[in-house]
Amino acid sequence: MDIKEEAIETEGIVKESLPNTMFRVELKNKHIVLAHLSGKMRKHFIKIVPGDKVKVELSPYDLTKGRIVYREK
C-alpha cells in the first residue's frame, strides 16, 4: 500500500454559506475555495457562519476544494 498524500492545512475566513454544509472560504493568500464540514464537526453540531475564522485542509491534487477541520474561537 502507498502512503497517503498529506493534506495542505491553511487558515481562512468563511465568506458565504451554501446549501448542504458547503462554504466559500477566502484563504490567507486571497484564493477562494469551496469547502465542506468534516465529519466530526457535523457529528458535534458545530455551527459555521460567514465571518468565522477556520482551518481548512486542501488536497494536493485539487486546490479548489477543501474540508473545514476547525473553527477558531
Swiss-Prot record:
Keywords, ordered alphabetically: Cytoplasm, Initiation factor, Protein biosynthesis, RNA-binding, rRNA-binding
Entries under InterPro entries matching the protein: NA-bd_OB-fold (IPR012340), RNA-binding_domain_S1_IF1 (IPR006196), S1_domain (IPR003029), TIF_IF1 (IPR004368)
Claim: Chloroplast is one of the keywords in the record: no
Superkingdom assignment: Bacteria
Single GO MF descriptor: rRNA binding
Residue span(s) of domain S1-like: 1-73
SMART domains: S1
One Gene Ontology CC term in the entry: cytosol
Compartments, record wording: Cytoplasm
Predominant localisation class: cytoplasm
Family assignment from sequence similarity: Belongs to the IF-1 family.
Functional description taken from the UniProt entry: One of the essential components for the initiation of protein synthesis. Stabilizes the binding of IF-2 and IF-3 on the 30S subunit to which N-formylmethionyl-tRNA(fMet) subsequently binds. Helps modulate mRNA selection, yielding the 30S pre-initiation complex (PIC). Upon addition of the 50S ribosomal subunit IF-1, IF-2 and IF-3 are released leaving the mature 70S translation initiation complex.
Assembly: Component of the 30S ribosomal translation pre-initiation complex which assembles on the 30S ribosome in the order IF-2 and IF-3, IF-1 and N-formylmethionyl-tRNA(fMet); mRNA recruitment can occur at any time during PIC assembly.
Protein name: Translation initiation factor IF-1
Upper lineage: Bacteria, Pseudomonadati, Spirochaetota, Spirochaetia, Spirochaetales
